[in-house]
Amino acid sequence: MSLLEQLDKNIAASGGLIVSCQPVPGSPLDKPEIVAAMALAAEQAGAVAVRIEGIDNLRVARSLVSVPIIGIIKRDLDESPVRITPFLDDVDALAQAGAAIIAVDGTARQRPVAVEALLARIHHHHLLAMADCSSVDDGLACQRLGADIIGTTMSGYTTPDTPEEPDLPLVKALHDAGCRVIAEGRYNSPALAAEAIRYGAWAVTVGSAITRLEHICGWYNDALKKAAS
């Protein structure tokens, strides 16, 4: 059974939750052993996969969890706005560390390495390639280039203003166009995640609402302050 077939089976059985285990950078939780513990807890709670940034985090998590890991490396580049897995060496390192799926930025922005080359390198390692996209055009272009999975990860993050709500219309448009879609980005409640499935998502990635304690506390603090004013 291929990994995609296994994921199809697991998603059908459990609903399709993927947990992004990426603490706020510099947080007390931003340690490989804590990231790995989050990943294990997510697996035990029914997640079909986890998404992890960084080689050290991935390597430690891989030793604990049996579910597939979507691996990424984030970089801040002077010459490009692309942050997610921008280099071929990043793909190689993630493959060696144990990623089953490698995600790359799939937007049509200036970049050090072409999306096509990154996807080909992922497939060279016999792994699944995921493209993190911001639009229908991005998603369809990446699908034509061979991406196995299209994520809505970058929707709302390539422009100055990020909306509060997730991009459900993008999920539907990509699904209707024949893409295997992972809905990601601002799915901060179970209701929104469920709505993504109704719009055609194959699975839904949730990050901040599960693994970023600072964000969750901020939401509660803002609500309490507003109620008290």
Swiss-Prot record:
GO terms for molecular function: N-acylglucosamine-6-phosphate 2-epimerase activity. It comes from the Bacteria. It holds the Pfam family NanE. Keywords: Carbohydrate metabolism, Isomerase. GO terms for biological process: carbohydrate metabolic process; N-acetylmannosamine catabolic process; N-acetylneuraminate catabolic process. Pathway: Amino-sugar metabolism; N-acetylneuraminate degradation; D-fructose 6-phosphate from N-acetylneuraminate: step 3/5. InterPro entries: Aldolase_TIM, NanE, RibuloseP-bd_barrel. It catalyses: an N-acyl-D-glucosamine 6-phosphate = an N-acyl-D-mannosamine 6-phosphate. It is an enzyme of class 5 (isomerase). The keyword Isomerase applies. Gene3D superfamilies: Aldolase class I (3.20.20.70). Its EC number is 5.1.3.9. The keyword Repressor does not apply. One of its GO terms (cellular component) is cytosol. Belongs to the NanE family. Converts N-acetylmannosamine-6-phosphate (ManNAc-6-P) to N-acetylglucosamine-6-phosphate (GlcNAc-6-P). HAMAP family: ManNAc6P_epimer. This is Putative N-acetylmannosamine-6-phosphate 2-epimerase. The lineage of its organism: Bacteria, Pseudomonadati, Pseudomonadota, Gammaproteobacteria, Enterobacterales.
